[in-house]
UniProtKB/Swiss-Prot annotation:
Name of the featured protein: UDP-N-acetylhexosamine pyrophosphorylase-like protein 1
Keywords for this protein: Nucleotidyltransferase, Transferase
InterPro entries, per the entry: Nucleotide-diphossugar_trans, UDP-sugar_pyrophosphorylase, UDPGP_fam
Similarity annotation: Belongs to the UDPGP type 1 family.
Organism: Danio rerio
Residues given in the record as UTP binding sites: L110, A111, G112, G113, K124, Q198, G224, D255, K379
Enzyme class: transferase
EC id: 2.7.7.-
Pfam families per record: UDPGP
Length: 505
């Protein structure tokens, strides 16, 4: 792109100030700047800047009018681990493993965010929460994929593949690619790990003007996890899924240490019910818990953010004392490939733009970098769950929080969602698995611990124990290894230890 072409494009969008420092730039700086500007589409840019300014003013005057239009998800559209018998859960698991065995299931990771709130500059998936093994979130997830493939292979006598699609951003793609290469893709075939980058869009001032973060660089931000749908087309991911005959997709966020990759029970539940779109939910812990609620508004399924619900609505209870709006969203979804194609081709442009008012560093009229002390800019983003409204058959699946949801969002010192709470959640789960398998722990005097099945994030489990996902996906196969075994803390059950235990049975 030439300077004249860039100028014409920006004039058409009413953003000529972007080139105000052109005469001060080196040839190299001009080249990279023109490359960035070439990615912008004038029509989209005009609409984006106009909508950002308008949305910011609406955002400041938002009210709770949604409350009167909200309805909970009808019981017939909610499956539940807690309320289902073992036979039903087994039926769903069998169906899920069948679909996996036929190479019809893939997983897609939303990994565009950095670990800023954790106090690190690298992608969250590279974070080590302090497990005895030292494993990162990426490694845990990769090993769960390997194990669920193995479970399907053994059940159906085949050799299947669960492709792993990873949506990154400008900030996370490079480090993530290097991390996977350096770690030999954690045992997965590199051709089955497909990374792609979501779109970046300009940050805009309250006056509707694009913000410059440098003299030759526009302040850009990822377009939210709802940018997935456009990225699936832009990066030919839907075409890749079709080539692989993938029909069902499990989509999740990177920061949940308990996530079950391609969960056969969830996949089986959705497929059995003929769903084109599904969401895992957990029962809200308390009315004001800061999680979105899956519900219906004017008869259409969607997620309402906790900040949009008035306290009196959040506190509504049913005849049994349960919260009426209890289905907490955990960013853990099921989609059919055909539904994703419909969204990408027909509905993506209709997705709601959510406003985030942020402090955006910028260069002033003199070219000096300014780090604002109060919010000065607007970042627009779309959310992955805003497609529920387009579903022809939506279902929700309630899972147990202690088994499936422990997000990593904040640095230690915060009350919730920290490396410590994530670590405790996983270790407590593994402690419960060992007790359920008939194992027990000895203290330093070789006396048995008193079993304690109920463990919480506020304390460490009575014994430190970690089970590799390569040994057990959701607690299966442990009884033959651990029944009537006396173990000492810390105990790490990896593949080598499992082989040793088999030889002592």
């Amino acid at each position: 792109m030439s300077f004249e072409e860039a100028k014409a494009k920006l004039e058409a969008a009413g953003q000529t100030h972007v080139l105000q420092f052109w005469d001060e730039l080196s040839a190299e700086e001009r080249g990279t700047f023109l490359e960035e500007i070439s990615q912008l589409q004038p029509d989209e840019l005009v609409e984006h800047c106009r909508e950002a300014a308008a949305s910011a003013s609406r955002h400041s005057s938002a009210d709770g009018r949604l409350d009167a239009r909200m309805q909970p998800v009808p019981p017939e559209f909610i499956g539940s681990v807690r309320k289902s018998d073992r036979e039903t859960l087994q039926k769903w698991e069998n169906e899920g493993l069948l679909q996996i065995s036929q190479d019809r299931v893939a997983v897609l990771l939303l990994a565009g965010g950095q670990g800023t709130r954790l106090g690190v500059s690298y992608p969250k998936g590279m974070y080590n929460v302090g497990l005895p093994s030292g494993k990162t979130l990426y490694q845990i997830q990769a090993e769960r994929i390997q194990k669920v493939q193995e479970l399907a292979n053994v059940r159906h006598g085949c050799r299947c593949t669960v492709p792993w699609y990873i949506m990154t951003s400008e900030f996370t793609l490079g480090p993530t690619e290097k991390f996977f290469k350096d770690n030999k893709y954690f045992g997965l075939c590199p051709s089955n790990v497909v990374m792609f980058e979501q779109r970046m869009i300009p940050a805009v001032g309250f006056d509707g003007k694009i913000i410059l973060e440098k003299k030759n660089k526009i302040a850009m931000a990822p377009d939210g996890n709802g940018g997935l749908y456009r990225s699936l087309v832009d990066n030919k991911i839907l075409a890749d899924m079709e080539r692989r005959n993938v029909e069902f997709l499990h989509v999740y966020c990177v920061d949940n240490i308990l996530v079950k990759m391609a969960d056969p029970v969830f996949i089986g539940f959705c497929v059995t019910n003929g769903a084109d779109c599904g969401a895992k939910v957990v029962e809200k812990a308390y009315p004001a818990e800061p999680v979105g609620v899956v519900c219906r508004v004017d008869g259409v399924y969607q997620v309402i953010e906790y900040s949009e619900i008035q306290p009196e609505t959040a506190e509504l209870r049913g005849s049994g004392g349960e919260l009426v709006f209890s289905a907490g969203n955990i960013c853990n979804h099921f989609f059919t490939r055909s539904f994703l194609r419909d969204v990408a081709e027909k509905f993506e442009s209709k997705l709601k733009q959510h406003v985030a008012i942020k402090k955006v560093p910028f260069v002033d009229g003199e070219g000096n970098l300014v780090k604002p002390t109060k919010p000065n800019g607007i970042k627009m983003e779309k959310f992955v769950f805003d497609v529920f409204q387009f579903s022809k058959k939506f279902v929700a699946f309630e899972v147990l929080r202690e088994e499936e949801f422990s997000p990593l969002k904040n640095a230690d010192g915060a009350p919730l969602d920290t490396p410590t709470t994530a670590r405790r959640s996983l270790l407590a789960q593994h402690y419960r698995w060992i007790l359920a398998a008939g194992g027990s722990f000895l203290d330093e005097q070789n006396k048995p611990f008193t079993p304690k099945h109920s463990t919480a994030q506020i304390e460490d489990p009575p014994a430190v124990c970690e089970i590799s996902p390569l040994v057990s996906y959701f607690g299966e196969g442990l009884e033959m290894l651990l029944n009537q075994k006396n173990l000492k803390s810390p105990f790490i059950l990896d593949e080598n230890e499992a082989k040793n235990l088999v030889h002592t049975v």
